[in-house]
């Protein structure tokens, strides 16, 4: 019973671990040795001897044989010195090797009668009664077929270039294997190489006995060999005899393809050459390439302006050039209005009870408003119309005697004279007017568009008080149009007025000429070495009337100066003619400009220039020295 347990253990171990030739799986041998030693305590290994099993092999799965090495101190010449014993499952005792001769020297051959497939075997090698080596295996695990036989080849095809050829290699299975009956299934592996080479090339395993070989060179010789193994095992048998393949001699011209053109070197050198050429091209044309890839940003240019002026910072010249164009105007050339905006509130009933606009215009506040240096800035945070820089600029222009302001001055004097004329007629009818003779020639201070410019004449204080008395007279104010409808306000600060009515009472216009309000001959306070030609013309024109009423002779500070006057004698001749021209009706101005905003509902308007009766005063302002003025005076 113990023997059968041992055989069962060996069978289970042999199913998982295969015994191969001269070496067995160590785990399998260990388990088998331990089992044998348990069953047979006398089975021991003689470690001092050199005898051992080399391999056990079955060529066809029907028979097998085992081989061992001969020790240095042992020889088969001494019968019974070395023995091999075996045991299997169906035999319950150890038996000696059945054939020591058929398999060769130091071997034991088991024919088909002693071979059982799928049955575990255990063998031991003894020398002089001691166990030298032992192992266990199964027959199907030690199969190593014999080499194939009948190896040959057949030419299949030759290429059109007569350089390559295809062949078919055939062989026969080992003669001792029953492949046809299916007792054993073999796999074949073919190796080939060129003659004089050392490394064999291997093809994939095949189950057939033939394999094609493609693209073999006709000018080469090849060697072919084949070996086989049982399917699903790893151990191959021996190689067959080497088959030498030699193709028939071909035309020598067909072997010209042996010379392989060095395409690889040409490609490498070509890439290097192109790289060097590209670098040289980039280096030589780097500026142009840079402009193509990164075009320069165009320099900003203004037509008609030299860029050097902008670089050097000459802004005055740039502004002068830009001022030529209509779409550009320097900030100093803009017409600054006195008031940038007007805030009107006509819905406040409390403001109506404070007084009429006429009283507000003719009150003392109006006279005080002429002193614009003390005016308060009420423009709600906007740029003040009374800033010093604007005032200095305007007064400077007026002091330099702008031609436009001098031309408009006689018109304003004439318009105010008409107003005073109406007032004088009303005063002549009252008893209080007898004390104020008309020959006093009052001087009226008009509000010019740029600045107040009073004419310095004799008796200024007395005439100013008389005029103030006349303007504050309610009877005289009833006949004057102090109101006009505002139809529009221009962006420059001008007010567009609707045409007003003439005298409401129908009184005839005063025949008094504008000479009443024209400045008389008086002492001229000469602040500089010259004064305006327009003042000289006015003085000459009024000289005859003034001499009859004034006893003050003009006196001038004499200085050596240059003269830039024109047409003084002509002006003196024309002055008499201008006096005889009858005064026509003064048209009501359609436009005026705002001078001062006294309250949300009160406006102080500038005197508007009226049409000139004489075109001669449109000439530019000239300068007259005091010496020449004394000479031309009558």
UniProtKB/Swiss-Prot annotation:
A motif (WSXWS motif) lies at residues 236-240. The chain crosses the membrane at residues 261-284. It comes from Ovis aries. It is found in: Cell membrane. It comes from the Eukaryota. This is Growth hormone receptor. The lineage of its organism: Eukaryota, Metazoa, Chordata, Craniata, Vertebrata. GO terms for biological process: endocytosis. The WSXWS motif appears to be necessary for proper protein folding and thereby efficient intracellular transport and cell-surface receptor binding. Residues 451-471 are annotated as: Disordered. Disulfide bonds join 56-66, 97-108, 122-136. InterPro entries: FN3_dom, FN3_sf, GHBP, Growth/epo_recpt_lig-bind, Ig-like_fold, Long_hematopoietin_rcpt_CS. It is a single-pass type I membrane protein. A motif (UbE motif) lies at residues 336-345. Residues 19-260 are extracellular. Residues 147-250 form the Fibronectin type-III domain. The keyword Nucleotide-binding does not apply.
């Amino acid at each position: 019973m113990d023997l059968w347990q041992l055989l069962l253990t060996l069978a289970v171990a042999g199913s998982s671990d295969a015994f191969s030739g001269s070496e067995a799986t160590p785990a399998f041998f260990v388990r088998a040795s331990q089992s044998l030693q348990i069953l047979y305590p006398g089975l021991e290994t003689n470690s001092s001897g050199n005898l051992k099993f080399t391999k056990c092999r079955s060529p066809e799965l029907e028979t097998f044989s085992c081989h061992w090495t001969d020790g240095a101190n042992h020889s088969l010449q001494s019968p019974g010195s070395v023995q091999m014993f075996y045991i299997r499952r169906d035999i319950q005792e150890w038996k000696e090797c059945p054939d020591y001769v058929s398999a060769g020297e130091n071997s034991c051959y088991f024919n088909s009668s002693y071979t059982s497939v799928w049955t575990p075997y255990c063998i031991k090698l003894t020398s002089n009664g001691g166990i030298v080596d032992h192992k266990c295996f199964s027959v199907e695990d030690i199969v190593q077929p014999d080499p194939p036989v009948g190896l040959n080849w057949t030419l299949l095809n030759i290429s059109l270039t007569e350089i390559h050829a295809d062949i078919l290699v055939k062989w026969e299975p080992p003669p001792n294997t029953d492949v046809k009956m299916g007792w054993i299934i073999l796999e074949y592996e073919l190796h080939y190489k060129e003659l004089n080479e050392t490394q064999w090339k291997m093809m994939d395993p095949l189950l057939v006995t033939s394999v094609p070989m493609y693209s073999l060179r006709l000018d080469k010789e090849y060697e072919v060999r084949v070996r086989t193994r049982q399917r699903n095992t790893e151990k191959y048998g021996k190689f067959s005899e080497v088959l030498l393949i030699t193709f028939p001699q071909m035309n020598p011209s067909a072997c010209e393809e042996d010379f392989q053109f060095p395409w690889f070197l040409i490609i490498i050198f070509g890439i290097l050459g192109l790289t060097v050429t590209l670098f040289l091209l980039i280096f030589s044309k780097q500026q142009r390439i840079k402009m193509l890839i990164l075009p320069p940003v165009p320099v900003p240019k203004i037509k008609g302006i030299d860029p050097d002026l902008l670089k050097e910072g000459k802004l005055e010249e740039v502004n002068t050039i830009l001022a030529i164009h209509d779409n550009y105007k320097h900030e100093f050339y803009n017409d600054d209005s006195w008031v940038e905006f007007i805030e009107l509130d006509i819905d406040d009933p409390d403001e109506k009870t404070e007084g009429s606009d006429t009283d507000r215009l003719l009150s003392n506040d109006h006279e005080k408003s002429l002193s614009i240096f003390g005016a308060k800035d009420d423009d709600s945070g906007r740029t003040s119309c009374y800033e010093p820089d604007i005032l200095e600029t305007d007064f400077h222009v007026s002091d330099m005697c702008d031609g436009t302001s001098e031309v408009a001055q006689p018109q304003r004097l004439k318009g105010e004279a008409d107003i005073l004329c109406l007032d004088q007629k009303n005063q002549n009818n009252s008893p209080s007017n007898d004390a104020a003779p008309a020959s006093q020639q009052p001087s009226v201070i008009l509000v010019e568009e740029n600045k107040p410019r009073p004419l310095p004449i004799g008796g200024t204080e007395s005439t100013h008080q008389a005029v103030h008395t006349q303007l504050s007279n309610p009877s005289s104010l009833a006949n004057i149009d102090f109101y006009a409808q505002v139809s529009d306000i221009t962006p420059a600060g001008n007010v567009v007025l609707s045409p007003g009515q003439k005298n409401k009472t129908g009184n005839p216009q005063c025949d008094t000429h504008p000479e009443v309000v024209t400045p008389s001959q008086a002492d001229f306070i000469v602040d500089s070495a010259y004064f305006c030609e327009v003042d000289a013309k006015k003085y000459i024109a009024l000289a005859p009337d003034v001499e009859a009423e004034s006893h003050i002779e003009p006196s001038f500070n004499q200085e050596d100066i240059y003269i830039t006057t024109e047409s003084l004698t002509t002006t003196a001749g024309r002055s008499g003619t201008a006096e005889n021209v009858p005064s026509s009706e003064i048209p009501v101005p359609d436009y005026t400009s705002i001078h001062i905003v006294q309250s949300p509902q009160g406006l102080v308007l500038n005197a508007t220039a009226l049409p000139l009766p004489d075109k001669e005063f449109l000439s530019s302002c000239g300068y007259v020295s005091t010496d020449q003025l004394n000479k031309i005076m009558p």
